[in-house]
């Protein structure tokens, strides 16, 4: 009987020991799980997401006022991918001062551009041969027009402007008067300066206000910041808001504004031309030898897009 009791005791001890070992294993496993759960995740610095690049070519025309929308004005819109569209454009050949001589053959459409070329006739007093292109249609506010332009790299004004055609009684908006290569050594900012302005003339009484926006002040991420007018195409435009307010644009960004002293209300034509004059405010007279250089003597217009505001 004593042996039976001893055997039973040993058996009970073995069972208790096994149970304790099993419980210990389970406890250790649970402790390990708890410890692993308690471990902080690796504190990795999340990769910085690069800011989305701004496509400045999509920012114009500007956002319309509430309840309004932009519609294209087809008569003042042209990609210049075909031939010179005589339904939309013509060549008024009135001259500026000597030495300018406007000629029809010095402008046209080719290779996807409207072009205006300055050439030399050294036998004449008016030796600066050039041209002008003007819209047949007119436009009034509220409107927006813009044109993508690469300038001739000569000392001359490459212009994109609006005018009603009467010098003594006129409204005029000069979107650009660009000169990327002034000869006078007196206009160091001209290769980047727009020279935007307005004129309001009544019976030869002139009111004027100008803005000299410089493309070196465009946003840092704008790919055309600091690029000279002759080095790349730039998109220049104007938002003629109302009878007083005129906002200029450059490469998708606001580029200065002017406020008219008098109501600015006349219907205006769109014009491009290329001309020179021996004055410092233009940048000095063109160098004759530059007019014989086919790589720099031509102003190129890739396209023009024009819009009117209407109620939705």
Q: Residue spans of the language-model regions?
A:
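Positively charged n-region of N-terminal signal peptides that target proteins for export
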Residues: 1-4
